[in-house]
Amino acid sequence: MSRTNFETLLEAGCHFGHLKRKWNPAMAPYIFMERNGIHIIDLHKTVVKIDEAAEAIKQIAKQGKRVLFVATKKQAKEVVAEKASSVNMPYVTERWPGGMLTNFPTIRKAVKKMANIDKLMSDGTYSNLSKREILQISRQRAKLEKNLGSIADLTRLPAALFVIDVCKEHIAVREAQRLGIPVFGIVDTNSDPNCVDYIIPANDDSNKSVEVILNAICGAIAEGLEERKAEKVDTEAAGESAEGEAAAKAPRKRGGKARAEKAAPAEAQPAAEEATEAAAE
């Protein structure tokens, strides 16, 4: 069953592309027609591509891996932050930090610096600093929070990127390609689909369009996380059951051995008596 449908996408305006003069010829297979100088996206193909991307991203989440959402354009910032947070995934909605992926250790150092500042505030050291130092540190903390706060929990490279506008986020896409990280993306008629592993042809300039697609994608991630959780519970239950069976069998073995040991002297007693009588004769 599809995660969305033609009518829902149509109502959200997912079919509106860019002006014909701005189109990328590589998007031709996903364009249905031209109307008033604007390309119209084939939503039947969009439905299929959403399902393909959702299934792939579900498997990534099921393995316990992270998906990094990237959307620095104004129309998509809020909805991406909301949807990514709902499934506990990291996101970047401010300026993309150059080297975020290719120079990840440096980014992690900046995140740790933010944690160290928080520690200063909590352990009382902060109050011993001068007003000027406190102001400088506070500004630095605010800047780090703005740019890196949403990826503070990202301790290793993400397993995938989900990009809202591959044209605008070309630096992030290029870094992911260099590292072999799969890219999922909403691709409008002015973008190149060849730089994306899982393309979702749709309007990337509309808040409603982005929200409808993210509902399907984040729904798939939530399913993957739930299935992972259920499998973990089943595995633990199976382990406890196996331990219980082993414990139940162990006493019976010891009891059987004890009974055998008790029976042995009883059987040996008549034999000893017979031997004594024979010796007396």
Where do the language-model regions lie?
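Short glycine/threonine-rich loop/turn motifs
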Residues: I171-D234
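Extended, charged alpha-helical interaction scaffolds
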Residues: K131-V163, C167-F184, D188
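Short hydrophobic alpha-helical runs that function as membrane-insertion/retention elements
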Residues: V67-L68, P90-T93, F162, P182-I186, ...
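Long, low-complexity, intrinsically disordered segments
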Residues: E267-E281
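Short, ordered loop/turn segments at secondary-structure junctions
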Residues: C14, K45, T72-Q75, E94-L101, ...
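N-terminal cationic and glycine-rich segments that engage phosphates or anionic surfaces
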Residues: M1-R66, T72-K73, K77-L120, K131-I134, ...
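Residue-level signature of catalytic and energy-coupling elements of molecular machines
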Residues: G13, F69, L161, I213
